[in-house]
């Protein structure tokens, strides 16, 4: 059952990522129709901006994420022996280098991981998590975060965030060009085409325009769908590492029962946390939820 869940989640992720790339190209094609009356120009623009932005995002250091979330590095075992030992042992079981260890001085129990590859991984936990969890529960949470690193989830989420940003940029470019009347040549060409093909070109233009306007919203929904799926996969992978679903279940129950929201959290970092720092109590995931409901995560773990 465990390995079936892992395989199913991996397949679903592949489909989501492929769909994401296709969606970006579709947005580019729509912008090409709106701006140049030629979808190929838009495809090239989307591909170039997308590749450049992804490269910049992937090259960004995880230290930036740690700084944004006020995380301080643990440089020696003596500073946090239980946390250090847990991270070290889970990394060893996962077969990856030991990630850097950080602590966020916040009373709300939570954790997150960064690093686009296992060699550049880092794990951060809040002070509240260390104070509230037993060691076997902490192992479940750390195994979950180690799984994110091992499964290259941070790289995937970075690409997804970059693609959402690219779509927003492309949409903004199109809207600005329309607003400032920079499409005069395109409109003239389109008018000539419409004389020959009736209202077909006008309909295509309107559909493309509506698609570009809605694209950032749709892209954000896809990004969060990917994030929710990777949380399920990390839970299953954590059980694979610890062989003890009860530890992770107990940790989720304790975190769910804690009503404190994180005092200082970067809005752009919400999706990387073990549990949503906004403390949503919904039982069903919404389109724009970065995490599946804790009740759903617990149910899946109990069925393993």
UniProtKB/Swiss-Prot annotation:
GO BP, one annotated term: proteolysis
Record-listed E.C. numbers: 3.4.24.-
HAMAP family given in the database record: Pept_M48_protease_HtpX
Cofactors named for this entry: Zn(2+)
UniProt record similarity statement: Belongs to the peptidase M48B family.
Membrane topology note: Multi-pass membrane protein
GO terms for cellular component: plasma membrane
Disulfide bridge map: none
Keywords: Cell membrane, Hydrolase, Membrane, Metal-binding, Metalloprotease, Protease, Transmembrane, Transmembrane helix, Zinc
Class in the EC hierarchy, top level: hydrolase
Keyword Transmembrane helix attached: yes
Protein name: Protease HtpX homolog
GO molecular function: metalloendopeptidase activity; zinc ion binding
The record's free-text note on cofactor binding: Binds 1 zinc ion per subunit.
Residues bound to Zn(2+): 144, 148, 231
Subcellular location: Cell membrane
Residues spanning the membrane: 14-34, 39-59, 159-179, 202-222
Catalytic residues of the enzyme: 145
Organism of origin: Listeria monocytogenes serovar 1/2a (strain ATCC BAA-679 / EGD-e)
Gene3D superfamilies: Metalloproteases ('zincins'), catalytic domain
The organism's place on the tree of life at top rank: Bacteria
């Amino acid at each position: 059952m465990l390995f079936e869940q892992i395989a199913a989640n991996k397949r679903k992720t592949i489909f989501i990522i492929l769909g994401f790339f296709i969606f970006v190209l579709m947005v580019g094609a729509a912008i090409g129709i709106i701006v140049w009356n030629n979808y190929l120009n838009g495809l090239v623009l989307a591909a170039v901006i997308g590749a450049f932005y992804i490269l910049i995002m992937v090259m960004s250091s995880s230290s930036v994420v740690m700084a944004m979330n006020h995380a301080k590095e643990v440089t020696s075992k003596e500073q946090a022996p239980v946390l250090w030992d847990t991270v070290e042992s889970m990394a060893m079981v996962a077969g990856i280098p030991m990630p850097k260890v950080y602590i966020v001085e916040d009373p709300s129990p939570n954790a997150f991981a960064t690093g686009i590859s296992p060699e550049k991984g880092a794990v951060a936990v809040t002070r509240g998590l260390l104070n509230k969890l037993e060691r076997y529960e902490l192992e479940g949470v750390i195994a979950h975060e180690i799984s994110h690193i091992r499964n290259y989830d941070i790289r995937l989420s970075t690409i997804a965030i970059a693609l959402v940003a690219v779509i927003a940029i492309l949409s903004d470019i199109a809207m600005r060009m329309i607003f400032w009347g920079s499409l005069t040549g395109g409109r003239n060409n389109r008018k000539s085409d419409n004389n020959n093909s009736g209202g077909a070109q006008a309909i295509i233009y309107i559909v493309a325009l509506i698609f570009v306007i809605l694209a950032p919203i749709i892209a954000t929904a896809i990004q969060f769908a990917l994030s929710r799926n990777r949380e399920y996969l990390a839970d299953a992978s954590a059980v694979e590492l610890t062989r003890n679903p009860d530890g992770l279940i107990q940790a989720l129950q304790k975190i769910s029962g804690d009503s404190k929201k994180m005092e200082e959290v970067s809005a752009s970092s919400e999706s990387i946390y073990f549990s949503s720092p906004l403390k949503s109590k919904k039982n069903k995931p919404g389109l724009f939820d970065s995490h599946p409901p804790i009740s759903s995560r617990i149910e899946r773990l109990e069925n393993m």
